[in-house]
UniProtKB/Swiss-Prot annotation:
It is found in: Cytoplasm. InterPro entries: aa-tRNA-synth_II, aa-tRNA-synth_II/BPL/LPL, Phe-tRNA-synth_IIc_asu, Phe-tRNA_ligase_II_N, Phe_tRNA_ligase_alpha1_bac, Phenylalanyl-tRNA_Synthase, tRNA-bd_arm. Its cofactor is Mg(2+). Keywords: Aminoacyl-tRNA synthetase, ATP-binding, Cytoplasm, Ligase, Magnesium, Metal-binding, Nucleotide-binding, Protein biosynthesis. Mg(2+) binds at residue 269. Its EC number is 6.1.1.20. One of its GO terms (cellular component) is cytoplasm. This is Phenylalanine--tRNA ligase alpha subunit. The lineage of its organism: Bacteria, Pseudomonadati, Pseudomonadota, Alphaproteobacteria, Hyphomicrobiales. The gene is pheS.
Length: 369
């Protein structure tokens, strides 16, 4: 066996014996490094005669190429083995039950839970979710909703205003989610006019709203959900059916009596407030039974002025809308006495009233089962 054959055999044995990338790198340096055994052989070619170089050159270069290829193959094998070992170490048996300690580390906030419940119910009735900015213009928050400048109903909204900008326009924190109704109607009206797609509107709008209130039942920031339907045939009967189905599903009762009382909202005409049947004789309110009534939401047919300003002819289209405080109905359903506790970030309160993240109720299985 020649010296080159012996050297190649030794190097290949060292490569096969390497158990990690550090070992492979050590073999590479020993063989192909600046002072490596194969590199030293290559250096000898410079001192050979042309005849010797012609004989030895191909053999030494062939050795270098075979060693390089063997190093590459072994490095690839080791990398694959390392990945497989890591996957084996980190393998998770997804059929195992969740440990109680892991499941109890966090809770779904009641507000998030109730928003999910509300949107699930309306989604089952064919509604889509719409959203809009918290910072609004005076036009979208008031004027487009039939609150003209100087209208006394503006005083009912204790509004947070920003300082005027360089154009003199003063923006505000929206006092209700109703501006999203106007944005949506404008969008659908533009789509109708440009593309000829005259589609009905069926949306629910959950979100934050802001007013300067703070007591046990009011907060400067609170959550509201509104709904809007606009179509050529929308009517009060449709509205009553939608709201009755919602109340039955949300409060999980087979039937519920509703009472509508005349009211006033600038953006609807006629406007009504809805009370639902309940029993308040015990420590918790029971819905769908008893002789008591509890106000739950406000609603009405969209005012012709609002339709007109949003791009709809009130002689052709009709709509109905409703709105309710998410925080308030969460308090009613789950027996929470103080609205301010929703925003105190008290871990004990969350542990008591929150929902398990891996046991989230569904509409199909019962909202609060």
């Amino acid at each position: 066996m020649s010296d080159l054959e012996q050297l190649e055999r030794q190097i290949l044995e060292d490569i096969a014996a390497a158990v990690d990338e550090q070992g492979i790198e050590a073999v590479r340096v020993a063989a192909l490094g600046k002072k490596g055994t194969v590199s030293e052989k290559l250096k000898t070619l410079g001192g050979m005669s042309p005849e010797e170089r012609q004989m030895q050159g191909p053999a030494i270069n062939g050795l270098k190429n075979r060693v390089t290829e063997a190093l590459s193959e072994r490095r690839t094998e080791l990398r694959k083995a390392a990945v497989a070992a890591r996957l084996e170490r980190e393998k998770v048996d997804v059929t195992l039950p969740v440990r109680e300690s892991a499941a109890s580390r966090g809770r779904i906030h009641p507000i998030s839970q109730v928003i999910d419940e509300i949107t699930a119910i309306f989604a089952d009735m064919g509604f889509s979710i719409a959203e809009g900015p918290d910072i609004e213009t005076d036009y979208y928050n008031f004027t487009a909703l039939n609150f003209p400048e100087g209208h006394p109903a503006r005083e009912m909204h204790d509004t947070f205003f920003f300082n005027p900008d360089e154009k003199g326009e003063r923006k505000l924190l929206r006092t209700h989610t109703s501006p999203v109704q106007v944005h949506t109607m404008e969008k659908f009206a533009a789509m109708r006019d440009k593309e000829g797609r005259d589609e009905p509107i069926r949306i629910v709008i959950p979100g934050k709203t802001y007013r300067m209130d703070s007591d046990a039942t009011h907060s400067p920031m609170f959550h509201q959900v509104e709904g809007l339907v606009v179509d050529k045939s929308a009517n009060v009967v449709n509205m009553k059916w939608v709201l009755e189905e919602f109340c039955k599903a949300f409060f999980e009762v087979p039937s519920v009596k509703m009472r509508m009382r005349p009211s006033f909202f600038p953006f609807t005409e006629p406007s009504v407030e809805v009370d639902i049947q309940c029993d308040r004789s015990g420590p918790h309110v029971k819905f769908g039974e008893g002789n008591d009534w509890l106000e739950i939401l406000g609603c009405g047919m969209v005012h012709p002025n609002v339709l007109r300003m949003s791009g709809y002819d009130p002689e052709v289209y009709q709509g109905f809308a409703w709105g309710m405080g998410i925080d308030r109905i969460a308090m009613l359903k789950y027996g929470m006495p103080d609205l301010r506790a929703f925003f105190d970030a008290d871990v004990r309160w969350i542990e008591h009233y929150g929902f398990r993240p891996l046991d989230i109720p569904t509409l199909f299985g019962g909202l609060s089962a």
